[in-house]
Curated annotation (Swiss-Prot):
<keyword id="KW-0949">S-adenosyl-L-methionine</keyword>
<comment type="subunit">
    <text>Homodimer.</text>
</comment>
<feature type="binding site">
    <location>
        <begin position="90"/>
        <end position="91"/>
    </location>
    <ligand>
        <name>S-adenosyl-L-methionine</name>
    </ligand>
</feature>
<comment type="similarity">
    <text>Belongs to the class I-like SAM-binding methyltransferase superfamily. Cx-SAM synthase family.</text>
</comment>
<comment type="function">
    <text>Catalyzes the conversion of S-adenosyl-L-methionine (SAM) to carboxy-S-adenosyl-L-methionine (Cx-SAM).</text>
</comment>
<feature type="binding site">
    <location>
        <begin position="65"/>
        <end position="67"/>
    </location>
    <ligand>
        <name>S-adenosyl-L-methionine</name>
    </ligand>
</feature>
<feature type="binding site">
    <location>
        <position position="137"/>
    </location>
    <ligand>
        <name>S-adenosyl-L-methionine</name>
    </ligand>
</feature>
<feature type="binding site">
    <location>
        <position position="40"/>
    </location>
    <ligand>
        <name>S-adenosyl-L-methionine</name>
    </ligand>
</feature>
<protein>
    <recommendedName>
        <fullName>Carboxy-S-adenosyl-L-methionine synthase</fullName>
        <ecNumber>2.1.3.-</ecNumber>
    </recommendedName>
</protein>
<dbReference type="Pfam" id="PF13649">
    <property type="entry name" value="Methyltransf_25"/>
</dbReference>
<dbReference type="InterPro" id="IPR029063">
    <property type="entry name" value="SAM-dependent_MTases_sf"/>
</dbReference>
<dbReference type="GO" id="GO:1904047">
    <property type="term" value="F:S-adenosyl-L-methionine binding"/>
</dbReference>
<dbReference type="GO" id="GO:0016743">
    <property type="term" value="F:carboxyl- or carbamoyltransferase activity"/>
</dbReference>
<dbReference type="InterPro" id="IPR041698">
    <property type="entry name" value="Methyltransf_25"/>
</dbReference>
<feature type="binding site">
    <location>
        <position position="204"/>
    </location>
    <ligand>
        <name>S-adenosyl-L-methionine</name>
    </ligand>
</feature>
<keyword id="KW-0808">Transferase</keyword>
<feature type="binding site">
    <location>
        <begin position="122"/>
        <end position="123"/>
    </location>
    <ligand>
        <name>S-adenosyl-L-methionine</name>
    </ligand>
</feature>
Length: 247
């Protein structure tokens, strides 16, 4: 994957535009997310490990909001399910184009990987096939809050017995002191990874109108309302978490 350093917000901007997954972001995305999301590499690699426990023969494994395909690659490395395929979907044409390049490179390095389709489209309009694993890796937070329950309900309906949704998200906290502490710690994490205060502030301004995080309890209650029977947090680092939701 690209090793370009994220410098998108390094210079003062007279007007900070809303964050978008455009070509500029795609070019530096691996660096950006590694330096911005604590625990991201651990989440991605273990998504493959977890998926191998839930994958069922002759089903689909979905990577919804697949970006450059890091989760898709992890699924293909770890899952050996007869008749399984991975479907990765993203609404950014720049992401989809680069994702296909990376997956073609993966095909050239490894044998016996699951077949994969990479689609450009809106996951809200996706016609789900019977699925045993659905990964929503830092995707739900970019969907309008009023549309989240319906999407989760459709995912639940698509899951076969023994399958699972794996949901990773940034968290917000109802307690003001807890929110302030975790925000400060996250800023410290980004500083430690080389981001300046200007970059941190401008990125926050760019993303606050397009990313709307929920609390852990909001996630739990919504998943239960969507028909899931059990919600199990398996990972948290600072204000980022990953959950397993069982049908």
């Amino acid at each position: 994957m690209s090793k370009e350093t994220d410098r998108i917000f390094a210079q003062p901007l007279s007007q900070v535009p809303d964050f978008a997954f455009n070509e500029d972001v795609v070019r530096v995305f691996p660096d950006m997310i590694k330096r911005s999301v604590p625990g991201y590499p651990t989440i991605v690699e273990n998504l493959g490990v977890l998926a191998a426990q839930f994958a069922q023969p002759n089903t689909v494994l979905y990577d919804l909001g697949s970006s450059l395909g890091a989760v898709t690659q992890a699924l293909r490395r770890h899952v050996r399910g007869e008749g399984c395929e991975v479907i990765a979907i993203d609404n950014s044409s720049a992401m989809v184009e680069r994702c296909r390049e990376y997956l073609n490179a993966q095909d050239s390095m490894f044998q016996e990987l699951l077949p994969v389709q990479v689609l450009e489209g809106d996951i809200l309009a996706l016609a789900f096939k019977p699925a045993s694993v659905v990964a929503l890796n830092f995707t739900l937070q970019f969907i309008a809050p009023e549309q989240r329950l319906a999407l989760l309900g459709r995912i639940r309906d698509a899951l076969v017995p023994g399958g699972a949704l794996i949901l990773s998200e940034k968290l917000r906290f109802d307690d003001p002191q807890e929110q302030a502490l975790l925000t400060d710690l996250h800023i410290a994490f980004k500083r430690a990874n080389g981001y300046s205060d200007l970059e941190i502030a401008q990125k926050r301004s760019a993303i606050e109108n397009v990313m709307k995080p929920d609390s852990l309890e909001e996630h739990r209650q919504r998943l239960l309302a969507a028909g899931f029977s059990k919600v199990v947090p398996w990972f948290q680092c600072l204000n980022f978490t990953s959950l397993i939701a069982l049908p």
